[in-house]
Amino acid sequence: MRGLKDELLKAIWHAFTALDLDRSGKVSKSQLKVLSHNLCTVLKVPHDPVALEEHFRDDDEGPVSNQGYMPYLNKFILEKVQDNFDKIEFNRMCWTLCVKKNLTKSPLLITEDDAFKVWVIFNFLSEDKYPLIIVPEEIEYLLKKLTEAMGGGWQQEQFEHYKINFDDNKDGLSAWELIELIGNGQFSKGMDRQTVSMAINEVFNELILDVLKQGYMMKKGHKRKNWTERWFVLKPNIISYYVSEDLKDKKGDILLDENCCVESLPDKDGKKCLFLIKCFDKTFEISASDKKKKQEWIQAIYSTIHLLKLGSPPPHKEARQRRKELRRKLLAEQEELERQMKELQAANENKQQELESVRKKLEEAASRAADEEKKRLQTQVELQTRFSTELEREKLIRQQMEEQVAQKSSELEQYLQRVRELEDMYLKLQEALEDERQARQDEETVRKLQARLLEEESSKRAELEKWHLEQQQAIQTTEAEKQELEQQRVMKEQALQEAMAQLEQLELERKQALEQYEGVKKKLEMATHMTKSWKDKVAHHEGLIRLIEPGSKNPHLITNWGPAAFTQAELEEREKSWKEKKTTE
């Protein structure tokens, strides 16, 4: 029903715009009443004038409306429409309202009835947006159909030339421009009026009336069994047959559904090109004029039944939908391409601006580089002049330095020789100091041993004195104890003798230790003498060493051999170092 409402709206739009004289989008209420009444009549919808008054009650003066006619049209008319009205009568009513205002006054090669059919075809092929137009692709499709119906050859180059001259500001033609295009004979040159009219009628029957095929054939009666010629018209779900092609006297219908079938029959009873249409309750036997017509009708009926089984629309409507979908897809792709082109153009403009900015920066940089190059050349000349002067001065200084180096090399060699001698003396002094340190250690060891022996000797002497006192006390004891004490005295005498022997031994060891101490003391004196001798030699040779260094205005120390090679601070530092070493040893 949605597709039916869209098709009805196109014709109603023409009628409404024809009533809108000042093109304000509004029509007076009285005109809308007439339009609504006529629509309800031709569409076989109950008319309710009270609903119209109620819908527009807020604006009783002048043109309507604040709420608009479209909501009323949808609610009270289009939603109630059933597919039981006469489409030709409906289109004729809308055509009558708009034709006088819009149809060109120029003479046309087609009749007004043909113009009406072109107008209906326009509504079928136009885009689903308002104001209604037919795009060049659909114009080409329609003109091809008309040319084929007229039996002529399609001139593609002529149509391409027409498209080139097409107004770029327009996306397509209006209904009245299409009527004028077909009516002026631009694409039907050499064809008479009758041929053009027949072609328009044939295309109208196919696209609007859904006539898939039509023509004369013989039909066998069900009661009398006689054969009668009839004009057959095949539509998507019915085959109607008439007395003649003027369609005035209809004799019957063959209702088609998915259960019907068509079969070819062999020739019989003098009838040729026979085929059979089997329906639910009846079977129709038909004879075509020749084998070609028979095959065409069988194929057409079979295709129609197949479409009914699939639930598909008629071929021309399905083809129209495919073309629209293809155009939508192409339009979407074109819009996407235009969007990408705009993005690329914007990016290109940004790049151009960036390049222009870079060019300006490069020019500025080139200008600065030229100035800097000029300054650099000037500076280079100055530097070369200065360098030449400096080079000459450096050569002179280098020559003087070479002479000084030669002189200093000789002095350095002497200095190095003295340093080597001093190093040897330092090594010998270190050995002497080591001997002195070892002698001191030996002396300390002997001294500790002698002290230990003296301590043991005093301990023994104290013990002997104690024993002597005890012996004296024992002598003074009673006679009863004398014998026992005598025995103890004898034992103690023996112990005393042993202690005396140990004491003598300790005395001997003390004497030996004293002799060792005297020997070590002599060694220490000799080591001290040697250390003093080496120190004197080192001091003597250090006085001979003088570092090669630039002259100084500070006062020098004077030695027996001339100016000293060290300062007063260095001398004090060395004396401090020697004193610390001596204290440590």
From Swiss-Prot:
The keyword Cell cycle does not apply. One of its GO terms (molecular function) is DNA binding. SMART domains: PH. Residues 347-373 are annotated as: Disordered. InterPro entries: EF-hand-dom_pair, PH-like_dom_sf, PH_domain. One of its GO terms (biological process) is negative regulation of cell-cell adhesion mediated by integrin. Tyrosine-phosphorylated. Residues 351-373 have a biased composition (Basic and acidic residues). Residues 210-306 form the PH domain. It comes from Mus musculus (Mouse). GO terms for cellular component: actin cytoskeleton; cytoplasm; lamellipodium; nucleus; plasma membrane; postsynapse. Keywords: Cell membrane, Cell projection, Coiled coil, Cytoplasm, Cytoskeleton, DNA-binding, Membrane, Nucleus, Phosphoprotein. This is Switch-associated protein 70. The PH domain is essential for phosphatidylinositol 3,4,5-trisphosphate binding. It is found in: Cytoplasm; Cell membrane; Nucleus; Cell projection, Lamellipodium. Phosphatidylinositol 3,4,5-trisphosphate-dependent guanine nucleotide exchange factor (GEF) which, independently of RAS, transduces signals from tyrosine kinase receptors to RAC. It also mediates signaling of membrane ruffling. Regulates the actin cytoskeleton as an effector or adapter protein in response to agonist stimulated phosphatidylinositol (3,4)-bisphosphate production and cell protrusion. Spleen. Expressed only in B-cells that have been induced to switch to various Ig isotypes. Residues 316-529 form a coiled coil. Pfam families: PH. The SWAP complex consists of NPM1, NCL, PARP1 and SWAP70.
